[in-house]
Amino acid sequence: DKLDHMGIDVGVVSGIVSIIDYKVTAKGMSNHAGTTMMANRKDALVGMAKLIVAAEERARELSDTLVFTVGKIAVSPGQENVIPGQAVATFEMRHMEISRHSQKKFRTVNLNL
């Protein structure tokens, strides 16, 4: 993709990206969607959505060459009339040089759910 944008036809591979996967769980409290007022909800999916946005912003801050993706989310109990009590997502991070230090920086997301 980068070579196309730069108008270069041929490139030489200088490295292979490292891939780190995280399984992330957000826990809330399941309850009936019709009778639980907004102020009393602890929606795990809303918490996961906030965490995904914060992690994406953090990835952008850390490096122009780090990529971050969430490709899968499972919500429990998974009913449209029930507030989700749990959301589990797979976070994937790719970079040429993923050190323990950069992993620690990525994991540090200050979020008050």
Place the predicted regions along the sequence by residue.
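Midchain, well-structured core segments that form catalytic/ion-binding scaffolds
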Residues: 1-98
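Short, well-ordered amphipathic alpha-helical segments that serve as non-catalytic structural scaffolds
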Residues: 51-54, 106-112
